A protein has these predicted regions:
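Stable alpha-helical elements in mature extracytoplasmic
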Residues: 37-41, 45, 73, 82, ...
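Short, low-complexity disordered leader/linker segments with a strong preference
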Residues: 1-29
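Ligand-binding pocket segment of bilobal, Venus flytrap-like solute-binding proteins
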Residues: 173-240
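N-terminal segment of the mature folded domain
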Residues: 24-155, 298, 334
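Short helix-loop capping/hinge motifs at secondary-structure junctions, enriched
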Residues: 130-136, 155, 168-176, 255-263
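Short beta-strand->loop
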Residues: 33-35, 127-129, 147-174, 189-192, ...
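Sec-exported extracytoplasmic/periplasmic mature domains
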Residues: 46-55, 78-82, 91, 98-102, ...
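Extracellular/periplasmic juxtamembrane helices and adjacent flexible linkers that interface
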Residues: 256-337
Length: 337
């Protein structure tokens, strides 16, 4: 109910009220620092939002994009990249910006509906047409001779979702526990020949360079590959268990106040929740939040059994346990071995 109330208020705000500034400039620019697989989404959305904003306020807005591995993008903002908004792969990366650089408040997730996640996704497998290696589930990825393409959890948000999805699968097996899950992901990463820094790099490795038997990654990138990048060359395999990936968005307060872009940057994030924004999201293969839009695209996004980040104790605990220096990933992955 709380999210519905906030969402209703946002939609009301989008439809009413004039631009707050007395004499806004005729044109304005802003920077969206995002994670790897959202390139097409925001290329599309930025055009739609600019048209909406021009009609509403008379002001022209240019949205510049920066895309890369979510962890690397967060570090760039911490180190001084002046993002008006960040749209990253997971909450921990925006928490890091709040904690280390103090560029936005610690309660940033409470400012927009659904904990500031206007879309979701999950982790699936992309295989070559005909599925020549007969890959059906996570257990097939640990078989000898299977080449798995996946990005690096130290730099990529999607890679961290990959890791947790595999861990959740292992835990769900008969007798599954932390020890057996660790053994399972150890075997899995032994089949990964190279770790790209970001999810899109891994997609390029698999789709364009023809390396590997299976790509583990974002559902959005898999759908993009099947429908556009390599039509007729690939197929999606949905594992028996995956993870609910919730990529969040946030206003970077210190930047928008310095650059006087708060009003347009705030509207930019709010419009993601509008029917028009949600349609752009779904067209670009992310799962929309708005039920009316989700129903129209239900065939594209079948129901799956998904673990949640809450089952790992939240992102702060998951990051410390699995991905921090000396954590589980460092313990199980040795490059070249």
């Amino acid at each position: 109910m709380r999210y519905r109330t906030i969402l209703a208020a946002l939609i009301l705000a989008l439809g009413a009220g004039a631009y707050a500034a007395a004499d806004p400039p005729a044109s304005i620019s802003m920077l969206n620092v995002s994670f790897d697989p959202t390139r097409e989404l925001y290329d599309d959305y930025n055009v739609v939002f600019a048209a909406y904003w021009k009609k509403k306020t008379g002001q022209s807005v240019t949205v510049q994009q920066s895309n890369g591995g979510s962890g690397k993008q967060a570090r760039a903002v911490i180190d001084g990249l002046a993002a008006d908004v960040v749209t990253l792969a997971l909450a921990y990366d925006i928490d890091a910006i709040a904690d280390k650089a103090k560029l936005l408040p610690a309660n940033w997730q409470s400012r927009l509906p659904y904990n500031s996640t206007p879309y979701t996704s999950t982790i699936v497998f992309l295989v070559r047409q005909g599925n020549p290696k007969h890959i059906r589930d996570w257990n097939d990825l640990v078989k000898p001779g299977i080449s798995v393409i996946a990005p690096n959890p130290k730099t990529s948000g999607g890679a961290r979702w990959n890791f947790l999805a595999a861990w959740a699968y292992a835990l769900a097996q008969p007798g599954g526990n932390a020890e057996s899950a660790k053994a399972f992901v150890t075997k899995l990463y032994k089949n990964v020949p190279v770790l790209d820094s970001g999810a899109r790099g891994s997609t390029t490795t698999f789709v364009e360079r023809g390396i590997g038997d299976v790509l583990v990654g974002w559902e959005s990138d898999a759908l993009l590959a099947v429908n556009k990048l390599g039509r007729g060359r690939f197929a999606i395999v949905r594992p028996s268990r995956s993870v609910l990936a919730e990529p969040p968005v946030a206003l970077v307060d210190a930047v928008v106040d310095k650059r006087q872009t708060r009003t347009v940057a705030q509207a930019y994030l709010q419009y993601l929740y509008s029917p028009q924004g949600q349609d752009v999201i779904a067209r670009n293969y992310f799962r929309p939040r708005l039920p009316s839009v989700a129903r129209r695209y239900a065939g594209e996004f079948p129901a799956m059994k998904l673990a949640t980040i809450a089952q790992f104790g939240g992102w702060a605990k998951a990051q410390q346990t699995y991905f921090a220096d000396g954590g589980v990933f460092d313990q199980i992955y040795q490059p070249g071995q």
